[in-house]
UniProtKB/Swiss-Prot annotation:
The lineage of its organism: Bacteria, Pseudomonadati, Pseudomonadota, Gammaproteobacteria, Alteromonadales. CDD domains: S4 (cd00165). GO terms for cellular component: small ribosomal subunit. The keyword rRNA-binding applies. Residues 96-156 form the S4 RNA-binding domain. SUPFAM superfamilies: Alpha-L RNA-binding motif. InterPro entries: Ribosomal_uS4, Ribosomal_uS4_bac-type, Ribosomal_uS4_CS, Ribosomal_uS4_N, S4_RNA-bd, S4_RNA-bd_sf. One of its GO terms (molecular function) is structural constituent of ribosome. Disulfide bonds: none annotated. PANTHER family: 30S 40S RIBOSOMAL PROTEIN, SMALL RIBOSOMAL SUBUNIT PROTEIN US4M. Keywords: Ribonucleoprotein, Ribosomal protein, RNA-binding, rRNA-binding. The keyword Phosphoprotein does not apply. NCBIfam families: PRK05327.1, rpsD_bact. This is Small ribosomal subunit protein uS4.
Amino acid sequence: MARYLGPKLKLSRREGTDLFLKSGVRAIDSKCKLETAPGQHGARKPRLSEYGIQLREKQKVRRIYGVLEKQFRNYYKEAARLKGNTGENLLQLLEVRLDNVVYRMGFGSTRAESRQLVSHKSVMVNGRVVNIPSFKVSANDVVSIREKSRTQARIKAALEVAGQREKPTWVEVDNAKMEGAFKRVPERSDLSADINEQLIVELYSK
């Protein structure tokens, strides 16, 4: 499945919630009718079946993290093999992706921009360039912006925007050095309550 390249607000309207696909600190519902689906008949929301509800939740989480369907299913399979709660394992696997960690540290204004920074070899992990967005970051890893990329205006702008948001407790960032430490894998209580990962588990368990 190809990556979606259309309007970001349309995806958020389809899921009925802010997917944080746009940069900035202002929630997009102030300029976008999230309660109305896109399209001519968007105001007429169909009643979803149990399967439809589960599918929508899966699509929502997949779009938040910018992961393709095949990748997402593979993450679920890995989460199911791990000990503990499968849904929580799934979210943690998505959270330790390098592109997501770059976003959490504030080096990219969106996950899509952070993924681009990684792909363009602007990011280092423990002093080595890593250009794989799905690279799994471990506790105590140091993520930094490559020296020749530190003058990029978009990175400086992203850090300014990130400074207006509450910084995640599981990362520690030195803006001046453009360097951050991934202190630990976030627990479920650290992450958004707007996600119902159990619906995804139920969907894939069928």
